[in-house]
């Protein structure tokens, strides 16, 4: 530990055994406050360093909860392998080299483990997070998909496959596919919709079904939203059969609530029959966003339909390619107009007048 004066302030540094370099704790107006901070850092390092990975992991979801319970359950699942192998070790004993080796073998677990060590770092239980800055590329999921990755023809094939493999329930599956691809709602939101949520040409997304906790919750951003209900989406619902007294728009083959696990069993034969075993229902949301951008809507407009609250930033980063194609088409149209002599003719008429 080191306390020293720099200008009019007092600085505190501690030695980091992993980086073998001093780490800055903070700057304080008086030496007394700096010494107190030094003692506090020493105490936290002494007590925090003794906590094992297993002990911290056990209390992590409780002491550092995320807003959604499903996220806490997901994180708990993702750290399980790491805890089983390193649970008896002290938090501060995990080196960056070990973290990198683990992350290379288990890239899908990296985000959750990094978040756990981040929380330990914020409370000064460890000096550094060994899982930060590893330079390991993680999957971008649905990002960077080409504009023609999912087309209208693909959607139609999925609908046809649904009718083929599911018999009397086929029209419901087909309607669900069409509805999701036109509205862009998330799967959990789709399974929570009620007929009363369709109001004219609008759809009110009030709730979402959480398949991990088997509960009904608010939509992802914590509040209801009103979006556009295209005519074809309404027609898809009106054309499908219903159970007597059915309240949810989309239900299972026997009228029960749809959850992720049950839907996967229904979805797998459909996508296989359509020749697209790589698809998930969430990809209908991607199709919706891509289609709206190709129709010339702005990223902020598409964000409203999808339920994003970032004014289109995520739409641009995830689905930016269609808008670029549309932009090039508009530029080409403008250039063609110029090269065809329209602009020159206008100038000549203006000069003559």
Predicted stretch roles:
Residues 1-3, 160, 212-213, 219-226, ...:
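C-terminal secondary-structure termini that scaffold catalytic or DNA-interacting sites
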Residues 2, 135-136, 192-239, 317:
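Conserved tyrosine-mediated DNA breakage-rejoining catalytic core shared by Y-recombinases
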Residues 18, 40-46, 54-112, 116-119, ...:
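Basic/aromatic-enriched alpha-helical hairpins
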Residues 24, 92, 126-128, 139-161, ...:
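DNA breakage-rejoining catalytic core of tyrosine-based enzymes
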Residues 106-111, 126, 132-191, 285:
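Basic, Lys/Arg- and aromatic-enriched nucleic-acid-binding interface segment
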Residues 118-129, 180-204, 300-301:
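Short, charged phosphate-coordinating catalytic segments
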Residues 152-155, 208-209, 230-276, 300:
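Active-site/catalytic core of tyrosine-dependent DNA strand-transfer enzymes
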Residues 196-202, 278, 297-317:
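Short, polar N-cap/turn motifs at the start of nucleic acid-interacting alpha helices
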């Amino acid at each position: 530990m080191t306390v020293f004066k720099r200008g009019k302030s007092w600085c505190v540094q501690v030695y980091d055994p992993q980086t073998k370099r001093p780490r800055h704790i903070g700057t304080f107006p008086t030496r007394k406050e700096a010494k107190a901070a030094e003692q506090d850092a020493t105490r936290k390092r002494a007590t925090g360093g003794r906590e094992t990975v297993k002990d911290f992991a056990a209390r992590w979801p409780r002491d550092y909860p995320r807003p959604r319970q499903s996220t806490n359950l997901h994180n708990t699942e993702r750290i399980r392998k790491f805890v089983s192998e390193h649970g008896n070790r002290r938090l501060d004993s995990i080196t960056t080299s070990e973290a990198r080796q683990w992350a290379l073998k288990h890239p899908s677990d990296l985000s959750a483990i990094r978040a756990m060590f981040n929380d330990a770092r914020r409370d000064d239980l460890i000096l550094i997070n060994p899982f930060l800055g590893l330079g390991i590329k993680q999957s971008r999921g649905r990002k960077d998909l080409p504009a023609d990755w999912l087309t209208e023809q693909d959607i139609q094939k999925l609908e046809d496959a649904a009718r083929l493999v599911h018999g009397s329930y086929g029209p419901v599956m087909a309607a669900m596919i069409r509805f999701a691809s036109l509205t862009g709602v998330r799967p959990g939101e789709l399974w929570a919709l009620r007929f009363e949520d369709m109001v004219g040409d609008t759809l009110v997304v009030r709730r979402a079904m959480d398949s991990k906790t088997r509960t009904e919750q608010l939509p992802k951003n914590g509040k209801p939203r009103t979006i556009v209900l295209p005519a074809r989406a309404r027609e898809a619902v009106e054309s499908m059969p219903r159970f007597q007294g059915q309240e949810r728009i989309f239900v299972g083959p026997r009228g029960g609530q749809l959850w992720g696990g049950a839907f996967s069993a229904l979805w797998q034969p459909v996508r296989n029959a359509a020749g697209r075993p790589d698809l998930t229902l969430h990809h209908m949301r991607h199709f919706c966003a891509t289609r709206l951008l190709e129709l010339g809507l702005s990223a902020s407009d598409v964000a409203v339909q999808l339920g994003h609250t970032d004014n289109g930033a995520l739409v641009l980063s995830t689905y930016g390619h269609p808008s670029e194609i549309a932009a090039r088409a508009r530029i080409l149209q403008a250039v063609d107009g110029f090269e065809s002599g329209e602009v020159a003719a206008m100038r000549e008429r203006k000069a003559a007048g």
